[in-house]
């Protein structure tokens, strides 16, 4: 059966793979987009975004504050690269690295917005570069986000039935699940799923199997917040024939 440990490991490996690949692409873009604002006009949005990241900018360019000073695309790409690295550290630490969390992107949409600001400006004076690797990178981020690929989870139905029965048995305000008819089970489950909050469960009495299933569901919720809402695809309960 699926465990929360293997699920976390798979998601973190996916995130690490795609975020490291973004770093490779950003370094290539930094070598390509070498336009100088002493020669061409750069859109004000690029400078505005650099200013928004002033605190991180100081950390990125602490060794040479004037590096890429007349090459705003390269300067902003350096900041984006630092944010991607921080995002990966934040995810790999499962949210415990507070320094990384401060500099990390909250979601892939924030990264897309930064890249689109650059592309919009580049397209005003150099469409070849605007439609090249930069556009490819944007498309990749739109497709893969921080999760690379949606992870489906599959559990067998009898496993779920045992877990639900155990939860009912551990909750003083719920009936004996095994004694309920099929219709009664459906009614109880529908009623519980329709309202917020959870039954009063005495967790000390739960079996290891139930604890593992609850840990899995908690991991799914945590990872969706950490990596992105598209981290998981379908949750499949196989061989389902009753409640």
Language-model segments: residues:
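Extended active-site and interfacial segments that coordinate phosphate-rich ligands
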Residues: 2-29
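Active-site beta-loop-alpha junctions enriched in small/polar residues
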Residues: 153, 237-242
């Amino acid at each position: 059966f699926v465990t929360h440990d293997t699920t976390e490991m798979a998601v973190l490996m996916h995130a690490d793979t795609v975020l490291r690949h973004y770093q490779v692409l950003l370094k290539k873009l930094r070598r390509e987009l070498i336009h100088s604002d002493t020669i061409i006009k750069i859109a004000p949005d690029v400078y505005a975004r650099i200013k928004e990241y002033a605190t991180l900018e100081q950390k990125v360019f602490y060794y040479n504050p004037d590096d890429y000073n007349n090459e705003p695309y390269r300067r902003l790409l350096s900041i984006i690269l630092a944010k991607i690295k921080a995002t990966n550290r934040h995810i790999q630490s499962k949210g415990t690295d507070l320094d990384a969390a401060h500099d990390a992107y909250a979601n892939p949409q924030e990264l897309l917005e930064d890249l689109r600001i650059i592309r919009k400006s580049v397209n005003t004076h150099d469409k070849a570069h605007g439609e090249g690797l930069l556009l490819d990178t944007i498309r990749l981020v739109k497709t893969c986000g921080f999760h690379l690929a949606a992870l489906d989870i599959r559990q067998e139905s009898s496993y779920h039935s045992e877990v639900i029965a155990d939860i009912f048995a551990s909750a003083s305000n719920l009936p004996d699940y095994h004694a309920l008819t099929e219709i009664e089970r459906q009614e109880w489950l529908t009623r519980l799923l329709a309202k917020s909050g959870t039954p009063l469960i005495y967790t000390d009495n739960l079996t290891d199997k139930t604890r593992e299933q609850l840990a899995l569901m908690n991991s799914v919720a945590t990872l969706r917040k950490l990596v992105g809402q598209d981290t998981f695809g379908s949750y499949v309960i196989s061989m389902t024939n009753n409640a």
